[in-house]
Amino acid sequence: GSEMCIRDRKNVPQMLKAYICREAYQERLTPDSLYVNLRNLENWAKSEQNPVSKAILHSLLAREYADYMRYNRQLLSGRTALDTDEAPADIREWSSNIFVTKVDEHNLASLQDSVRLLEVSSKEYVPFVVLEDGSRFYGHDMYHLLAARAVDTYLLLDGFRADSLQRMRIAGIYEGMINTYRHRAGAEDATVLATLDYWKWKRTGSGISREPYATYRERKAQVDKEYLGALDNLIREYGAREICAEAYICKADLLRNMGASHMDEALQTCDE
């Protein structure tokens, strides 16, 4: 089981598999085992020489810290923020802002060596159950896997007063991905998908919905207009590729949502 994999220190691929399985099946660790895990992983990440293994360990650490916060939400909500530079040695005494900083540090570190991560296939690291449809178009590279994990981990910071950090980092990850794939030979499909994922997040998960209604309507109209422009650019640039069907579908949906004035255009999009 996952315990065994974690003890086998040299085997990072197995360990990542164990963690991803645990997440997929939503098995929860007890706070005590999380606590022990975090200390072991921290020591290992410091000493690991292989850059890809190191990146994976950072990704796992970010997620474990975020999980630890969520388990202890009640406890942390009553704590006064401590100075980040003077974090107590024992994480059981930390305040939530220190955890947020840790999650952020490890997420950033996990994506630092993007060039190297692009060269590594994620297949040997990922249990089959998790290679969902999306990643086959991304070519199963490790960079995409860790970037997607970092986004998910930042999303776990909801409710910990980290909204602006969360938005800034997630936008940065998507923009970095789009830029990276755009400049990489043979990564057209990944470029299209990263762009669609980015906009999906931007329209649903980037905090627009928390604004007062009048502001929200204006912002949403603005974002929808930008989204339409982005879809048109994708279609213009990659329209001949099979993957671009996704962009056509998104465009038809968007026009339908934008209202009747755009219906004619929506029908025309479907005909294309």
Can you describe what each PLM-predicted range is?
Residues 12-25, 54-76, 120-162, 185-212, ...:
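Amphipathic alpha-helical repeat scaffolds of TPR domains
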Residues 10-11, 50, 96, 135, ...:
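Short coil/turn linker motifs that delimit alpha-helical repeat modules in TPR/alpha-solenoid proteins
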Residues 167-177:
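Amphipathic alpha-helical segments within extended alpha-helical solenoids and repeat-rich scaffolds
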Residues 16, 35, 55-59, 101-104, ...:
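Conserved positions within tetratricopeptide repeat
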Residues 28-48, 68-133, 155-168, 204-229, ...:
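Short coil/linker segments at helix-helix boundaries
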Residues 1-6:
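Short, small-residue-biased leader/transition segments that mark boundaries at the very start
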Residues 7-9, 43-51, 178-187, 232-242, ...:
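Solenoid-like repeat scaffolds
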